[in-house]
A protein has these predicted regions:
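Hydrophobic alpha-helical transmembrane segments
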Residues: 21-22, 40-54
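Flexible, glycine- and charge-enriched loops at secondary-structure boundaries
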Residues: 46-47, 87, 131
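Short leucine-rich amphipathic alpha-helices used at interfaces
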Residues: 48, 71, 171-174
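Acidic, Ser/Thr-rich low-complexity segments on the non-lumenal side of membrane proteins
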Residues: 86-124
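Generic recognition of long tandem-repeat/solenoid scaffolds
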Residues: 7, 12, 77-79, 109-111
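Conserved beta-hairpin
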Residues: 51-98
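A membrane-cytosol interface segment of integral membrane proteins
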Residues: 112-174
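N-terminal membrane-targeting/pre-transmembrane regions
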Residues: 1-40, 166-181
Length: 181
């Protein structure tokens, strides 16, 4: 049996501080207004303000508390968001392993199986700026797909080409995967 290791897959987040400041400012403003309403209003308005606070906390938890990881021992890709059930897909049993664009400037590796669909964002050119997954992650994904689903060589060659491009310092917008955006 292969030695099992869990590899955390980092999220491809915006590098622009203004995006994070805007997000944080919005959350603080919503909580401040709802808190003021809870403190000063009565009846239904107070209940609604309390619900806004609760909904905001849940939404922030869903954005912040998410994890995607790869178990190299059994070739399984896992994804968990806040309190929702975990989704996992084994490379060998996946019905689909391919690239998927979201029509908003992001390209993800999508693995679909019986227990759900897991996506790993590989490339983005959107409001958050240009960014690509790192070469080490791209190569690990390619190696794991080759190990568990060797019939997917076309996809793994694309991942390796992207890894070489990123490692050479190439711009995400000019990368091999950029034509799929």
């Amino acid at each position: 049996m292969a030695e099992s290791a869990q590899l955390d897959i980092p999220r491809l987040l915006s590098r622009q501080p203004t995006r994070w400041l805007a997000f944080g400012g919005t959350v603080v403003a919503v909580l401040a207004m709802a808190g003021w309403a809870v403190a000063t209003e009565t009846g239904v308005n107070q209940v609604m303000a309390g619900l806004v606070v609760a909904a905001t906390v849940v939404a922030v938890a869903a954005v912040v508390w998410r994890r995607t990881w790869l178990d190299t021992g059994d070739g399984t890709l896992h994804h968990r968001v806040a309190f929702l059930p975990e989704r996992r897909v084994a490379w060998a049993q996946a019905t689909t392993v391919d690239l998927e664009r979201n029509r908003a400037g992001q390209l993800a590796l999508r693995a679909r199986g019986e227990r759900g669909t897991v996506r790993v964002t590989l490339l983005a050119d959107d409001l958050g700026g240009e960014r690509s997954a790192g070469p080490d992650l791209l190569r690990v994904l390619a190696d794991e797909i080759d190990r568990w689903a060797p019939e997917r060589q076309r996809l793994t060659s694309r991942l390796r080409a992207q890894a070489d491009h990123v490692e050479a310092g190439g711009a995400p917008r000019e990368s091999p995967l950029a034509r799929h955006l």
